A protein has these predicted regions:
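Transmembrane and membrane-interface helices of multi-pass
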Residues: 2-196
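Soluble catalytic regions of membrane-associated enzymes that act on cell-envelope
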Residues: 179-243
């Protein structure tokens, strides 16, 4: 028992171990929101490889804390960000079938206008109180959370953090490319709702950020559209003459 305790205490001295543990816990919370229940806790057992990949995505963002002395505060900010996205998805799925994606940010003005149709006044008040409580909690952490004692030069501290973050990013990127290449996950989703449950919230949401649909053609311009319209008008005129 003492050996196990000693081993745990030893590995806990490594920065990335902290980041990995917090990322695993955060990924489980996110998936519980994604699946609208505690079935999210079964995700690592149902799809272990994909769970690790989603955790690495979150861990890449959590690794930002390694650049700061107020690490608990930064870990908390990143956690609030991911939980906020997952909670938004949870709320959206209660009123529509398609999950929350990056494209929804482009529609935020329209969403605010029709928010009353999907969320009651009481729910809006509760959400506002929750936001205020979270902000207050973050301010408290900023002021009271302990700072990391740094015994090395700032340049070495930043370089060490950068190396660790790059390693995590390369692990996430490499695993993502491998899973996409082997077909274990997809980047384009036929059924968005099923994809979120099968491939995880983190992967699907990040995919919606990176891939926002069909790219604009190089030939696309106002002049080109005008010429295309004229061609279609000419076709309609010729067709009417024949009839």
């Amino acid at each position: 028992m003492n050996r196990v305790k000693t081993f745990v205490q030893k590995i806990w001295t490594y920065d990335l171990v902290h980041t990995a543990v917090y990322s695993i816990v955060l990924e489980l919370i996110v998936e519980c929101f994604n699946r609208r229940g505690i079935m999210g806790l079964a995700f690592p057992f149902m799809h272990p490889i994909i769970f690790i990949y989603n955790t690495l995505i979150i861990m890449t963002s959590m690794a930002l804390a390694l650049f700061f002395r107020r690490r608990m505060f930064v870990y908390s900010v990143v956690s609030v960000f991911w939980i906020g996205l997952a909670l938004t998805n949870f709320i959206i799925l209660s009123s529509r079938k398609t999950p929350f994606t990056a494209m929804d940010f482009y529609l935020i003005k329209d969403a605010i206008k029709v928010a009353g149709l999907y969320v009651s006044v009481i729910q809006i008040i509760l959400i506002a109180l929750l936001v205020i409580a979270v902000i207050a909690g973050l301010v408290f952490l900023w002021r009271k959370a302990p700072k990391l004692e740094v015994t090395i030069k700032k340049t070495k501290f930043v370089a060490y953090a950068a190396v660790q973050m790059i390693l995590v990013f390369l692990a996430a990127y490499g695993m993502g490319i491998t899973l996409l290449f082997t077909g274990a996950v997809e980047g384009h989703f036929g059924n968005l709702a099923q994809a979120y449950k099968k491939y995880g919230f983190s992967h699907c949401f990040v995919s919606s950020v990176l891939d926002r649909g069909i790219k604009k053609s190089g030939d696309y311009s106002e002049e080109y559209m005008d010429s295309l319209k004229n061609d279609l008008d000419n076709v309609d005129v010729e067709a009417s003459k024949k009839t």
